[in-house]
């Protein structure tokens, strides 16, 4: 497991009381911004996300070291606004990814870290889906973080072939985290 350090920004550096945490490791620097109070009930969410991103970064055939990404933990109202503004869909969703533009030339040693992009995750939708699918909150959060990360590095699921490739990689990453297949049907309760 990578060496993890966590520091919270001083209150004067935060906007409007938002909790702002930077987590650093040998894999991408992951900035987590909590913008919805409902996330405060999930004290370990940041650590779950970091572990999922670090594991995913270590398993993909892409250079993600010395890169950065930002994850916004929001609510259904916040993600609905993003979904409407960026995708034209006026409804909440579980996760949205916004990949950054890729550099056109070589990266030089003095260049700033490259930005992979941004991910937004909606608390209520995540919580509801986890319950409906009989998954733990942390397992579903890990899945959504991995799913969003894979979008940032170029994976997609627009075609059956793309979906098969992306879902297979998600299963492998989540298995490494000890999380069951997220696409398997939920077990029946008797």
UniProtKB/Swiss-Prot annotation:
InterPro entries xrefs: MetalPrtase_cat_dom_sf_prd (IPR023091), YbeY (IPR002036), YbeY_CS (IPR020549)
Subcellular location: Cytoplasm
GO molecular function: metalloendopeptidase activity; RNA endonuclease activity; zinc ion binding
Gene3D superfamilies in alphabetical order: Metalloproteases ('zincins'), catalytic domain (3.40.390.30)
Pfam families: YbeY
Assigned EC number: 3.1.-.-
Note describing how the cofactor binds: Binds 1 zinc ion.
Gene Ontology BP term (one): rRNA processing
Cofactor(s) the record lists: Zn(2+)
Keyword annotations of the record: Cytoplasm, Endonuclease, Hydrolase, Metal-binding, Nuclease, Ribosome biogenesis, rRNA processing, Zinc
Residues reported in the UniProt entry to bind Zn(2+): 147, 151, 157
A GO cellular component annotation in the UniProt record: cytoplasm
Main location: cytoplasm
Enzyme class: hydrolase
Keyword Lipid biosynthesis: no
Statement: the UniProt record of this protein carries the keyword Lipid metabolism: no
Superkingdom of origin organism: Bacteria
Family: Belongs to the endoribonuclease YbeY family.
Role this protein plays: Single strand-specific metallo-endoribonuclease involved in late-stage 70S ribosome quality control and in maturation of the 3' terminus of the 16S rRNA.
HAMAP family xrefs: Endoribonucl_YbeY
Protein name in UniProt: Endoribonuclease YbeY
Organismal lineage: Bacteria, Pseudomonadati, Pseudomonadota, Alphaproteobacteria, Hyphomicrobiales
